[in-house]
Amino acid sequence: MAKKTYDLLFKLLLIGDSGVGKTCVLFRFSDDAFNTTFISTIGIDLKIKTVELQGKKIKLQIWDTAGQERFHTITTSYYRGAMGIMLVYDITNAKSFENISKWLRNIDEHANEDVERMLLGNKCDMEDKRVVPKAKGEQIAREHGIRFFETSAKANINIEKAFLTLAEDILRKTPVKEPNSENVDISSGGGVTGWKSKCC
């Protein structure tokens, strides 16, 4: 049997309205890349990145979920087993911020009770087009007792910090145990891609 290359496996979800930049956030973290030509994610996409925290190698299994209404029935099954959820809105799109409460209800209905949540106000490099004040993001995060960052995949602002903070929060309340399996359940997902990369 092959030796495991990690100590813990954390399943993370990126959720939020279509077009808020979830895929760009994921690619910036996983591959330090930014591409303006992404098409909307169809169903689910998966990326894997291994990071080291507190002397532990942690495999982050990050699911990028479709934001369109018609895909909500697909994505609900992916809340199960998620240990961390990043809820993303676009600071230049008021509707994406207004829908935060709906996404938070989805988390309450479908995710584990103890899931770590984080709110990201994305595209903070587009200050001239901002319609959602930072204070509003901070307020809703406070009300729900969750962490908040403003991020930019394009300018690489707070992307790594957000992922590592979420992983640290999960690690703090995770009992140390051996990872169950190398297998990834993709039985009900859409297009899935994956790679492994190591953080130095």
Swiss-Prot record:
Chain location of the short sequence motif Switch 1 per the record: 32-46
Protein name: Ras-related protein Rab-10
Phylogenetic placement of the source organism: Eukaryota, Metazoa, Chordata, Craniata, Vertebrata
Annotated binding of Mg(2+), by residue: 23, 41, 64
GO biological process: axonogenesis; cellular response to insulin stimulus; endoplasmic reticulum tubular network organization; endosomal transport; establishment of neuroblast polarity; establishment of protein localization to endoplasmic reticulum membrane; exocytosis; Golgi to plasma membrane protein transport
Naturally occurring in which organism (per UniProt): Gallus gallus (Chicken)
Alphabetic keyword roster: Cell projection, Cytoplasm, Cytoplasmic vesicle, Endoplasmic reticulum, Endosome, Golgi apparatus, GTP-binding, Hydrolase, Lipoprotein, Magnesium, Membrane, Metal-binding, Nucleotide-binding, Prenylation, Protein transport, Transport
Residues lipid-modified (S-geranylgeranyl cysteine): 199-200
Function: The small GTPases Rab are key regulators of intracellular membrane trafficking, from the formation of transport vesicles to their fusion with membranes. Rabs cycle between an inactive GDP-bound form and an active GTP-bound form that is able to recruit to membranes different set of downstream effectors directly responsible for vesicle formation, movement, tethering and fusion. That Rab is mainly involved in the biosynthetic transport of proteins from the Golgi to the plasma membrane.
Localization, UniProt: Cytoplasmic vesicle membrane; Golgi apparatus, trans-Golgi network membrane; Endosome membrane; Recycling endosome membrane
Family: Belongs to the small GTPase superfamily. Rab family.
Notes on activation and inhibition: Regulated by guanine nucleotide exchange factors (GEFs) which promote the exchange of bound GDP for free GTP. Regulated by GTPase activating proteins (GAPs) which increase the GTP hydrolysis activity. Inhibited by GDP dissociation inhibitors (GDIs) which prevent Rab-GDP dissociation.
UniProt EC number: 3.6.5.2
GO molecular function, one term: G protein activity
Main location: membrane
Chain sites annotated for binding GTP: 18-24, 35-36, 40-41, 67, 122-123, 125-126, 152-154
GO cellular component terms attached to this protein's record: cilium; endoplasmic reticulum membrane; endoplasmic reticulum tubular network; endosome; endosome membrane; Golgi apparatus; insulin-responsive compartment; membrane
Enzyme class: hydrolase
Origin: domain of life: Eukaryota
